[in-house]
Amino acid sequence: MTQTTRVVAGIASVAAGTALAIWSTRDLREAKRTRAPGKHVAAARAFNHGSALLALSVLADSAMEHYRGSFENRAMYLPPVVALCSLGAALHGGADQRAASHRLRHAIQICGAATGATGTAFHLYNVTKRPGGLSWHNLFYGAPAGAPFALVLSGVLGAIAEQLRDEPEHDPQLFGMPAGKALALVAGAGLLGTAAEAALLHFRGSFQHPAMYAPVTIVPVGGALLAHAALAPARHAARASAFARLWLRLTAALGFAGLGFHANGVARAQGGWRNWSQNLFAGPPLPAPPSFSALALAGLAALRMRETER
């Protein structure tokens, strides 16, 4: 891959991320402009979009990593299957404009979150049972403890989207607080969690490329700004939301730019993409960076919802 090709790929990735961030919240912007009903449905659909992107990331990642592990444990077949079901449910929800939840979709997403939580426990057990127990070496080279958590987030976003559809249009509530505020806090916490996993793996890689600092700086700041915008008093709300929205669009673009960087990492390995069957497993994980974009899209939807509440 030549230097020119890499630059073009990076620009295309950033453009794709920005376009997806704007596209995902178009229903919310239209609802706000026309004052039409259904703002909470538009937010629910945006959360479905984020859930779908996370499920796709988990599907690709778990299928590759568990295949590399030769599916030694039969339970290793479960995450790809559940992620595929979650992806289907999220895509169906993203296309559904009805202000009513779907029981099957809701059940699938709850099942996905439960499967992700169980997988996190299994991965932590795998790390602690290795010689040396809980150590940096085992965290680096054992089963990635944060990987199944993406399935938890996908299920949570999808389940919240279904619950939001059943809330009244004039005053939707989640977890005992205004829906926009609750959605922003959930998305912000998800961004901080995914940034922590990226920090661990990039620390393992000794931050050998300056771009490896981006996920551990841009993404946590996005999560903090989102939480601040959710909790800010009314007199500071507009400014906080505007700055957080700008930063979240940058975060969404970063996810796709990271995909380009990881693809470049695979290309630079011995044999490049011609030796894809080995380098895809040995190189940086391609499905990981889009999880930032998924949570940024959810955060943008939450901010739009929060603005209508104020």
Which residues does each PLM region occupy?
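Short amphipathic, positively biased membrane-proximal segments
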Residues: 1-310
